[in-house]
Amino acid sequence: MKIGIIVAMDKEFAQLKAILSNTETEHFNHKDFVTGRLGDKEIILQQCGIGKVNSAIGAVEMINHYHPDLVISSGCAGGADTSLEVTDVVVATECAYHDAYCGDEVAYGQIIGMPARFKAPTELIEKALSLNNLPDCKDLHVKAGLTVSGEWFVNSREKMQQIMDHFPEATAVDMESCSIAQVCHIYQTPFVSFRVISDVPLKDNKASQYYNFWERIANGSFEVTKQFINLIQNPSLIHNS
């Protein structure tokens, strides 16, 4: 099975590259890709850059060149749900844009001609949630819910509340997952967003949790992605909901 993992930043890239074996670097169309192994799976890892355009370009290049069975948007995200804590994990049941408006004829966040929300395969959500019950993941908390994406680093309670006014059920917020989900929808490639929570803006002050995450906590926190991938077995079982 071939799995593509897309992250935005170099810190996330370094964390995830460390869980791979037999790595090699390849360069195509201004993008670097690292290929490697994780157990019996072939992994293609890419640092796409921050934001929707960078991530969409990265997803297109990955799908066109490597044809993965599954694409995962990984790295970190802000927690929209105040019950979350730093290093918890959110697997997105669906993704939406929090900064798109195409008029009252469609839902807020919906691009005309596209679904209002991009849903992940139910089987992958169940696999991710099953991590909560594994003996060697006893300190782990995985939660499923809506992830919203937009061109904004959410570093204030005020901005987070503005997003929640439109998406009160949002669980996490990032800058890439929905654009990758849209590309995968168009290219008919299974997709899931699986993100480690770096901060919870509604419980934070001036992104102090976020910076503390990278300074003190991040090392090893992406091992959970390895655990998740190990649970994914048969690509034929992955269907879009």
Name each model-derived stretch.
Residues A80-F167:
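Mid-sequence, gly/pro-rich, charge-dense loop/helix-turn segments that line enzyme active sites
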Residues P201-N240:
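His/Asp/Glu-rich mid-to-C-terminal helical/loop segments that flank catalytic regions of hydrolases
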Residues W152-L202, K206:
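A C-terminal functional module that forms or caps the active site or interfaces directly
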Residues E61-H65, S83-L84, A181-P190:
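Alpha-helix C-terminal capping segments
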